[in-house]
Amino acid sequence: MAYSIANNPLLRKNFAKIHKIIDIPNLIDIQKNSYKRFLQLDTPVDARKNSGLEAVFRSVFPIRDFSDTASLEYVSYSLGAPKYDVEECHQRGMTFAAPMKVKVRLVVWDVAKDPGTRSIRDIKEQEVYFGEIPLMTDNGTFIINGTERVIVSQLHRSPGVFYDHDKGKTHSSGKVLYSARVIPYRGSWLDFEFDHKDILYVRIDRRRKMPATVLLKALGYSNDALINYFYKSEEVKLGDNGAMTKLADAELLSNQKATADIVDPATGEVILKANRKFTKAALRKMAEHGIKEIPISEEEVVAKVASHDIYDPATGEIIVECNEELTQAKLEEIIQKGITTFQVLFIDNLHVTSSFRDTILIDKIGSTDEALIEIYRRLRPGDPPTLKSALVLFENLFFNAERYDLSAVGRLKLNYKLGVDVPLDCMTLTREDILEVVRYLIELKNGKGNIDDIDHLGNRRVRAVGELLENQYRIGLVRMERAIKERMSLQEVENLMPHDLINSKPVSAVVKEFFGSSQLSQFMDQTNPLSEVTHKRRLSALGPGGLTRERAGFEVRDVHPTHYGRVCPIETPEGPNIGLIASLSTYARINEHGFVETPYRVVSEGKVTDEVRFFSALEEEGHAIAQANAEIDKDGRFAADYISARKSGEFVLVGRDELELMDVAPMQLVSVAASLIPFLENDDANRALMGSNMQRQAVPLLRADSPLVGTGMERVVARDSGVSSVARHNGVVESVDASRIVVKIDEDQYDATGTGVDIYNLIKFARSNQNTCINQRPVVKVGDHVKAGDIIADGPSTDMGELALGQNVLIAFMPWGGYNYEDSILISERLVKDDRYTSIHIEEFEAVARDTKLGKEEITSDIPNLGEETLKDLDESGIIRIGAEVRPGDILVGKITPKGETQLSPEEKLLRAIFGEKAGDVRDTSLRVPPGVEGTVIGAKIFSRKGADKDARTEIIEKAEEMRLRKDEQDEIRIIRDSAIGKLKKLLVGKAAAVKIEGSDGKVLIPKGAAITEEMLKSFSMDRWDEISIADDDTIDEKVAQTLSTLNQQIDIIKYVFDDKVQKLRRGDDLPPGVIKMVKVYIAIKRKLQVGDKMAGRHGNKGVVSRILPEEDMPYMEDGRPVEIVLNPLGVPSRMNVGQILEMHLGWGAKGLGWKIEEFLEKNAPHDEIKRFLKGAYDNPEMDRFLDTLEGEELLNLARRLKRGIPMSSPVFEGASEESIQSMLTHAGFSTTGQVTLYDGKSGDKFMHQVTVGIMYFLKLHHLVDDKIHARSIGPYSLVTQQPLGGKARFGGQRLGEMEVWAMEAYGAAYALQEFLTVKSDDVAGRTRMYEAIVKGKHTLEPGLPESFNVLIKELQSLGLDVELLEGDED
């Protein structure tokens, strides 16, 4: 069985020391899973969970009319098949979406005269079309109007309750003021805050504040209840002789001082002296001696506050009210009335302050009703309050599920923070919640509890695609709900059907707007596979409901300890968005509540297990977590007694038995892009950030070359990005060509009677969003066996199934004639000659023929006033032929537009009379090649209106596409048929026939009782094989019949699919209104590396090509090999990205081993010798076993692949050590310094010092000088100021600002300056005169008034100032 090099991960020598515990989760699952949860398509209708789209429908329906006589109820929804597949949507500029139908039930009630009784009059159920909903492609993207878009996940503040303080900044005294905020998922915000006088206030929806007790009273609590809820009370007893004692409550006494000696009544022993603290020991001693009461002085009781009303026992009148301070007079009155016990509040102003009691005192509102009306007045100032409306408003604020939604996450966080146990399906606030929020805030002020850190990932959650779309759907449905209610009330409901009520337009409009113009719906970055993957894994704090760049402070942008393993601390954009846009770490995933989780290995009793569990930031709190590289002995126990670990965001040394968790892998800390940088651990973080970002800008090159020094992540990214073609089932490759691969599926992959074949049509030279080229190339051969998940075709920037963003080049670090000053790069012409850095870019141009007021535009090759030479590449339909080489100004699509009728001169009239009407009334509006574009036409697509006649070119294109489809159909049928024949032969050959079978001519083909042979079967059509009957075995007859019927069914399906595709092909296209025909032309532009192009390594070492030197002038080594790039050594020390040097050394070793293998091949060394060398180089028992299975040609194929160098993998944070690199260099026969002697290519002299030379992976970035260089002589002008426009895209000019004017003035260049400011810029009349002067050969300048001066005058006049210009030489 042949194997494929492409799918063998062993070929990359791995330096990792830690064995893999779990595979990296699929990199784009964050998108796919979220959308799957939103749509729930695979779930049966009745088993759908109340989440996603289902939840939206259930929350808005049932919709009742105003009089409650009818209701519209939701039953279920279903999605149809999309009208166009992904490929067709790309080509036609359509949205990839499925039609949605919703089943609703209209119930009409008969309302009886008695209140509360009603009966059903009528029920109607109907499926209603509900617009289209965009579907996600297999790669986690959406196709909207023909372009691929990504919905970026949003990182926002989680709903719940948050406690904070102002750090003493609000009030001049510097006093710390605490506040609490309850944030729902949707609904009113509730804020509690203290002011500098310690009064507690509340705000609803950030309106005017009022005492918090108003809200609590509105909930139905009285002053007494509130006082006793928030304070504890002490009982005071009055003795006969006027002595006072209070009950000894251990909880309240701790931290207080004794006011008098405490004596044991039985023995007279002093247990605690006066003015000493009640310590734990003292309290225990008191309990042992049975002391229940302690003496207090009268001064202590005065100024205490009564916790209940104190009544006169004789008359029942109130002496002291609840919450009233006891004065000396009141105390005497209590004693006089003979009251023996009363209760006071415990307030010591140290651990318990009087702030809540003070709040009650300033609050003058007594009853619940008054409180409700007060709240109504605050929220609706100007409306006359009634008790009923106030109650409704208050209920709707926090307790109505339609208006207020905490969400499951909010409820979870509330329960977690406040320690309450409310069921998770209770999504509104409860009275107890509000009381507990206030209690926690008061305790916080009293010094208990902690404030929340809003940047903690336990307080921020991710809203992925599904949830963002769910919110949009809710907005749309709420708009629709209003319209339905109005319709119900306007018309007689019993005569209506559900579809008369529902208009899905508002919903479709909201969804369309979200996908088309939301800040989080972005044009996919498709430069290379890595940029696609990173874009889908991005987390943004911006967007609707998030932060704004201007408002976001430093803390939000900073790296937080909880980011570890969840959000990458390295990858974030430079510039204003730094820290606001982040990337998910490699192993991170998002749980159903939207919190980011990271995996850890479980440690039990000091032993590391292979059990892996995912933890969110909150769940991880308090656990001690060891790092992945902590040393472990062979039994899985930690080697050292004390291990460095993380605990609650701090690094601590912990005993090995205290550890509970351990990291899964060292790279779990960083994102995908950062994990592709070898020796990341030796780079400065700022440069690593640039390196991660620049890898995403690498242009796919003509010849992809996977890195010699990688990190092992290359294969993962290539597989998950979706740019490569991946085998769907196990099987054998049946046929391969450049555009398709046919795989015959293994029999064990489908059921006994099924037959199978997979056809993979490869993408050839398609255009990406960034105009780079997408092209797939097969990496398997006929006869190769592939497993499901294997890569069978490479995409852009992938090589043998691995990500390949750049090229491995031979680099020397040395100055060379000043050409690598300040990060310039000197390159060898060899790189240009070998097309190492050549890339193909594809531009799309579009011509549209419209139906104008003056007549129809026409696409044709018959264009007035153009010569044969100009039209030589157009066919008769007026479209350029494929393969034509075009330059700026060439015609791509010939088009003429009718002109308005003009007054004709006599000469023109004569010409018209002679030559007919045509020539004069049309003008040439052909599509021409814009400046700066030069290339080859590689494709043209034509879209015509349904019912319009097709031109010759369309016919040719359709025919070619039909032939391709037919070939697929025939191959599929052939392979299925061959497979079935093989199966039937196994069943039939050698068995005895039970009946004879004759041909149409009466000739016996199979005699009765004869053993069936292959020749007999070949002699008649397979369709008649079901007539064969086998003697003594009925099961065979059944199997034969079943196999044949399955075969026929499958052939029917294939034919049906083919016919459907052909039908679609022949159908006209849906074009925008007013468009008759649309032509798209694709031009491939070959971009070679040239001076001015930007290049970079993977370590943030970027530069611009300054000179391309002939190969013979480059410095060369002793064996005559010239280096390919010369970099400046001064670019390394100050930037501290030493990783590039280590990468060079390891790459040098890898290349040296490759050269050694090449020597073996050249001298036809014995196979055993090659094997021995490879085993020594890899030093890996698994690789040894693999090499032992290879013989002959297979071994030589492998050696030929490895002669470019043995690929190495140096994973992030566990890369190759210095010793490993030195041993590689020794193995390759190089000096362990990694330096060689170089000779000057021009003079042949030896350079004085040895130079560091090695292989580095270098990328060409998407900042190409061809896209930036631009020149203008005459072009468009701005409408108002008449100054030239700016920028390449608008064909603009260079701006001459005021500073440039000063410079010209300083030089005294008056006439040049006058020219700049008038005829070369915005003097309209002067521009025309200049043209005339040049045409007539006069070289005089007549400047006039610049248009900007007129603009200034008009602006002054618009201010009401009468400005006039004086003409002539008036004084």
Swiss-Prot record:
GO biological process, one term: DNA-templated transcription
Enzymatic reactions: RNA(n) + a ribonucleoside 5'-triphosphate = RNA(n+1) + diphosphate
InterPro entries per the UniProt record, alphabetical: DNA-dir_RNA_pol_bsu_ext_1_sf, DNA-dir_RNA_pol_bsu_external_1, DNA-dir_RNA_pol_su2, DNA-dir_RNAP_su2_dom, DNA-dir_RNAP_su2_hyb_sf, RNA_pol_bsu_bac, RNA_pol_bsu_CS, RNA_pol_bsu_protrusion
GO cellular component: DNA-directed RNA polymerase complex
Keywords assigned: DNA-directed RNA polymerase, Nucleotidyltransferase, Transcription, Transferase
Keyword check for Transcription: yes
UniProt-listed Enzyme Commission number(s): 2.7.7.6
Top EC category: transferase
Family annotation (PROSITE patterns): RNA_POL_BETA
GO molecular function: DNA binding; DNA-directed RNA polymerase activity; ribonucleoside binding
Role, per record: DNA-dependent RNA polymerase catalyzes the transcription of DNA into RNA using the four ribonucleoside triphosphates as substrates.
Record-stated family: Belongs to the RNA polymerase beta chain family.
Subunit structure, interactors included: The RNAP catalytic core consists of 2 alpha, 1 beta, 1 beta' and 1 omega subunit. When a sigma factor is associated with the core the holoenzyme is formed, which can initiate transcription.
This protein's name: DNA-directed RNA polymerase subunit beta
Organism of origin: Citrifermentans bemidjiense (strain ATCC BAA-1014 / DSM 16622 / JCM 12645 / Bem)
Organismal lineage: Bacteria, Pseudomonadati, Thermodesulfobacteriota, Desulfuromonadia, Geobacterales
Gene responsible for this protein: rpoB
